[in-house]
Amino acid sequence: MAYYKGAASEGGRAAQLMKRRELAQQEVEFRKKKIEEDLKVSNIENKFAAHYDAVEQQLKSSTIGLVTLDEMKAKQEDIVREREKKLAQKKEEKDKEKLKALEAKLAEKDRQKRQIQALSFDPDDEPDGDDANDGDEGSGKESEKEDVKEELTVVKRSWKEQVPSGVKKIRKNPDVDTSFLPDREREERDNRLREELRQEWAMKQATLKDQEITITFSYWDGSGHRKSVAMKKGNSIYQFLQKCLEMLRKDFSELKTVMADQLMYVKEDLILPHHYTFYDFIVTKARGKSGPLFNFDVYDDIRMISDASVEKEDSHAGKVLLRSWYERNKHIFPASRWEPYDPTKVYDKYTIKDKSKK
């Protein structure tokens, strides 16, 4: 180790200068690293800003008029996806160019080596020192060639690892049941089939409602006056009462000032609301307390004791009467048996008398 051979004060001064120099060098290195880090961050931010600005510009140019938030988000996602795809393609092209440049560099070195080997040299003309230098130069070229090959291999490997991510396609397994997945063609086919069936059913119901039936009824004012009228199955009880009223006004003077709203239709001991149609009772095969509501023909009395347990489709003539008459006589048989029609109520057996009275 060398020692300072001079005055002690000069030696201390030299030590301080050395220390200052080291501190200055450390500060320079610190600033250099900080500048490099700032440059890296700024490059990243610039790339991100450029990417974001490009996306925003493309989004503004492709958006026309007012759009919803969901449409804006979907369009933004599509633009970002396209932007990322383009960036990936550019990166892939750069990697390919770098690979081509390395291959060209390696090919050039191989060509130069072949040209050098093609020249003839007399080993006796050169001194031994030159041979040693040539050996060193050859070994240096070999090491440089190995470095280039290694770098080329690394680039090829990285490029092969990146390419499948964009090229590889996800294929379906034909053996997997995908019937539960949404399928636009299948849904459209099912919707068409449902619409065809609906139209076919609607046509059948319209044809059924247009069919005519003969309804036998009895005007009831304490005794029966039987008549019949032709109606369509799609007609309502109110329309039926209007037609009955037109027919009965000729024979009964008390009905000349009466409207259809003031009449009632009682079928199988049930008071039928005016808004129901004959089609409603026929389709549902509704039943009343003393017979079926869907059959409007007239038979003999079916409420015999011997036949009470037998299911029949014979029916009685429905009664058309004034609502005022019912209000006056609803405590007297047969009006005491009548009750409003309830579609939720089931009449399993027909009866001949009121069960509440024994």
From Swiss-Prot:
Acidic residues bias (residue ranges): 122-137
Biased composition annotated in UniProt, kind: Basic and acidic residues: 104-113, 138-151
Mention any one GO cellular component term assigned to this protein in its UniProt record. nucleus
Which GO BP annotation is one of this protein's?
A: chromatin organization
In this chain, the stretch annotated as Disordered covers: 104-151
Please give the family membership noted in the entry.
Belongs to the FAM50 family.
Return the protein name: Protein FAM50 homolog
The species this protein was found in: Anopheles gambiae (African malaria mosquito)
Q: Mind giving the lineage of the organism this protein is from?
A: Eukaryota, Metazoa, Ecdysozoa, Arthropoda, Hexapoda
